[in-house]
């Protein structure tokens, strides 16, 4: 008999060879219609898996995230089968699941068009209607290579060559289609009913632009048609809010092929950038941070000492100067340690909170670049706190409180915190890990935040917190981080003299609130759909004239507003007033003052706000005072 343990710590005995589906039938009949796969010792497997030894057993249901991921995995296979039946000459490459869906890469001379997606969907529905079983088989390496070679599936052969020699080669069959796959899959194709193919794009084998170009078809799949409809409606909203589109319309920034992954900030976009930077700078000053500036170009030797050369070299931009290899910095932390090391430090100097708006560069494949969200050149609101072990809790709490204050100001109140604790392989003593982990937990609790545990997912040099924002349409954006580091100060020779007169390495806290300014601006644009809060809007006030007689009054009001640091502009063109109003609303100007004969006579303005069609008259002095009350923070 074998012992099978369950999540409630109970144990049942079964004959070896019992299938996962039989255990569910016997013990969990209420889950029969919801079960899609099982977990044996935390490994996801098919329902038909035979259990031959003692294990921990869990049921994966359709209503779980893992269950939904399996539905999407199934649908990717069904799409590949449909395409192979419609276009036999097409070669399959890889088809993973991704956030909210899946994709599959194909090698073919045929150019897939968006119009063909509906026909592919029809073929997929035919396959689903047949209710074909997903059948798992284990093949020898030789069998797999021979089969896929005979089929001309060269990319599958390349994938097999990279599978470790000790691992089984598994394939899945559904109907006439056979694909290389680890699984798991649902019992049959019938579960994948709510899906939609969304777009076609180019890609490269292994993401390397030097390799042959492939074609990638994206899709999404959900449990029900209702969920699918909700998601597709959300996609329309996402498209409306696309920061690249809004950024162009509002003349904030642009990107061009001569500088891929780098931003050309226009006047209005740079205003937003500077407001955010200066706001964060002031918050840091008020919280005891010093600001520094470090070089962009540093010798390879520093990156070797820090350990980044071995782990991060492929993402560095390298050059050679005076016969020495140099790199544009991809991060600021080793530079901050150099400033710490520039003088003798005492325990009385700690904590030392060192901040930098550090511009960094990292290589990203061109296909991965995405507007402001994924770039090669970016500025971090970076800071490092050098402290003693006894100061960790207080510093972590102060950071969490600061971070929450900032997020609330920018309009984010729904924050998810992920806590990653010690991995098996790690540096530092259990004592310091205990203290660091307790500090992070305590700081999150004191800030009235809940956290999700990522067990064992911390870096080898310390535990971390990740702060994820939920935007106006429910998307999640990971921005803030608090990462403990027990290793880098030691590697780079940082120490302070303790109260005992001995040398000690400081604990280093890597922390950021926004992440990068570029990406955070992209998130803000999409969160607010371009309608930024008044204090953040590049133009806060537009003064529109109805007649020529109003020009002098309008200009005088503009000067009056600008003296109070209001970012104002005046429109004295000959266009009709309704056209002017529409034009400035399309520019997302939060406040319009409309000036005509009546307003001149009464020294007033007619006010219209971006989110309202109503207009009301107010004296110019009162209108300015009202605007000033919300024009800055």
From Swiss-Prot:
Quaternary context: Homodimer.
Residue ranges of domain TGS in the record: 1-61
Catalytic activity: tRNA(Thr) + L-threonine + ATP = L-threonyl-tRNA(Thr) + AMP + diphosphate + H(+)
Residues where Zn(2+) binds: 333, 384, 510
Residue span of region Catalytic: 242-533
PANTHER family named among the record's database cross-references: THREONINE--TRNA LIGASE, CHLOROPLASTIC_MITOCHONDRIAL 2 (PTHR11451:SF44), THREONINE-TRNA LIGASE (PTHR11451)
Signal peptide limits: none
Free-text cofactor note: Binds 1 zinc ion per subunit.
Gene name tied to this protein: thrS
Keywords from the UniProt entry: Aminoacyl-tRNA synthetase, ATP-binding, Cytoplasm, Ligase, Metal-binding, Nucleotide-binding, Protein biosynthesis, RNA-binding, tRNA-binding, Zinc
Organism (species): Ehrlichia ruminantium (strain Gardel)
UniProt function note: Catalyzes the attachment of threonine to tRNA(Thr) in a two-step reaction: L-threonine is first activated by ATP to form Thr-AMP and then transferred to the acceptor end of tRNA(Thr). Also edits incorrectly charged L-seryl-tRNA(Thr).
A GO BP entry: threonyl-tRNA aminoacylation
Location(s) in or outside the cell: Cytoplasm
E.C. number(s) listed in UniProt: 6.1.1.3
Record Pfam families: HGTP_anticodon, tRNA-synt_2b, tRNA_SAD
Full protein name: Threonine--tRNA ligase
HAMAP family cross-referenced by the UniProt entry: Thr_tRNA_synth
GO cellular component: cytoplasm
Broad class of enzyme this protein falls into: ligase
GO MF, one annotated term: ATP binding
NCBIfam families: thrS
InterPro entries per the UniProt record, alphabetical: aa-tRNA-synt_IIb, aa-tRNA-synth_II, aa-tRNA-synth_II/BPL/LPL, Anticodon-bd, Anticodon-bd_dom_sf, Beta-grasp_dom_sf, TGS, TGS-like
